[in-house]
């Protein structure tokens, strides 16, 4: 999962670095630029992590898995009854 998230982040960072500074920006040294990028990446990573954890918690608290299980059980029971009546 980390690899899936890190590849798009790496692509965005490379695009930002290769794009270069905007004309209105003053020239900065590489170390401050890399620190800025790392800070933004950490902020982005923590934001994504919070959102994913929140989504997982909501799924765990919801009764969707139970409803899905019940639905499949009901459908299976109906199919089973249909086979019994058809082939008996």
From Swiss-Prot:
Disulfide bonds: none
A single BP term in Gene Ontology: triglyceride metabolic process
Pfam family, one: ApoC-I
Keywords assigned by UniProt, alphabetized: Lipid transport, Secreted, Signal, Transport, VLDL
Signal sequence range: 1-26
InterPro entries named among the record's database cross-references: ApoC-1_sf, ApoC-I
GO CC field: high-density lipoprotein particle; very-low-density lipoprotein particle
Location relative to the cell: Secreted
Keyword Ribosomal protein: no
Transmembrane segments: none
Main subcellular localisation: secreted
GO molecular function, one term: fatty acid binding
Function: Inhibitor of lipoprotein binding to the low density lipoprotein (LDL) receptor, LDL receptor-related protein, and very low density lipoprotein (VLDL) receptor. Associates with high density lipoproteins (HDL) and the triacylglycerol-rich lipoproteins in the plasma and makes up about 10% of the protein of the VLDL and 2% of that of HDL. Appears to interfere directly with fatty acid uptake and is also the major plasma inhibitor of cholesteryl ester transfer protein (CETP). Binds free fatty acids and reduces their intracellular esterification.
Xref: PANTHER family: APOLIPOPROTEIN C-I
Family under the similarity heading: Belongs to the apolipoprotein C1 family.
Listed name of the protein: Apolipoprotein C-I
Protein's organism: Eidolon helvum (Straw-colored fruit bat)
């Amino acid at each position: 999962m980390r690899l899936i998230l890190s590849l798009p982040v790496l692509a965005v960072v490379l695009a930002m670095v290769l794009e270069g500074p905007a004309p209105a920006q003053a020239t900065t040294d590489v170390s401050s630029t890399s620190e800025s990028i790392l800070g933004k990446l950490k902020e982005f990573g923590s934001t994504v992590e919070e959102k994913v954890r929140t989504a997982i918690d909501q799924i765990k608290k919801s009764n969707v898995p139970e409803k899905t299980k019940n639905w499949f059980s009901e459908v299976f029971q109906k199919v089973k009854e249909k086979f019994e009546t058809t082939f008996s």
